[in-house]
Amino acid sequence: IRHILAVIGIDPLDFMKRVDGTFKQAIKYVNWLEGNGEYFYHAFDKFQVQPIDRAALRWHMSDRSVPFGETTSIQPVICELGRTPIPQRGSQFGEPLKFAFHMNALKFADMLCEIATARGVKHYLDHVTEVDMHDNGNIAAVLTKSGKRLEADLFVDCTGFAALLAEKKLEVDWVDCSQWLLCDRAITMNVPYEHHYPGYVRPYTTASALSNGWVWEIPLQTRKALGYVHSSAYISEDDARREIRAFEGPHAESLDTGTVHFKVGHRAKAWAHNCVCVGLSGNFIEPLESTGLYLSDLAIVMLADHFPFDDDSTAVAYRFNRVMA
């Protein structure tokens, strides 16, 4: 995300103000081993190592009194202290550590729309009702509910799991991976700080194991976002809702919840004919490591680097699909 902000030319401080953003420098995994409150960190930065990294070997040969994560990175300690990954202004103690951001995705979408339209992009808020095709199998135009006919040489399918272009019209197969990744639902909840939370914004994401999945806790500036990721084959929606309320505490009984349905897998071809899948229309891996953001970022960068400048996109589509599909 920091790379994308730099490419677009967005000031990180302005970004954080606009999208309710906070720092994210690690993921803290709680109750994944014994369920007794134990935890470990996946930090984003690590100590400089020699050409051969022997950190794991040294830790196994030690008395293991220090958690493994703390022997490879300073960030677990910084996270426990609730500190930012950026040194105080004017500090002489080095460069910032690696970090990302927590953000309100809807506010970020509004911000990107504002920037894009200011740079000449035309934005239509509409619904696609039909797709016209060329004889060669390429998409000719999309027709909208308001009566518009939008023609283009290249179409980007950002319609989520619906994949209105790639799946509904081009009939590109979806490669299902649910036999390996079982989770397919998330019960979501927002907890306002002012009423139900002490206002302590942690500089990391928390992933806590529950009976049939895990809960994300994402701290924003004004609220905490929770989501119980689980498999509908092993727990009902009502039971999952009760479990996330119990996890959060008595105040959660009065809070609204939502349900997100998702499928794990990828499109057999992320680039088919003159249609490129970006985001959920092309792939999704369960949200444990925020891979959805990474894959969307990668697809955008790949498309920019392999943008076709003539009618024959065979070579660039082949390379795009080797990476993305």
Predicted regions mapped to residue ranges:
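Extended charged low-complexity segments that act as oligomerization/scaffolding linkers
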Residues: 8, 12, 28, 196-198, ...
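C-terminal helical "tail/cap" subdomain of flavin- and related membrane-associated enzymes
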Residues: 305-325
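Predominantly flavin-linked oxidoreductase catalytic cores and closely associated redox partners
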Residues: 91-245, 300
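Conserved FAD/dinucleotide-binding core of flavoprotein oxidoreductases
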Residues: 209-261, 281-295, 306-309, 313
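Single, function-defining residue in the core of a domain
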Residues: 244, 267-272
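Dinucleotide-binding Rossmann-like beta1-alpha1 core, especially the glycine-rich loop
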Residues: 2-81
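Alpha-helix-centered segments that form part of catalytic cores
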Residues: 65-103
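Residue-level marker for buried hydrophobic side chains located in beta-strands
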Residues: 275-277
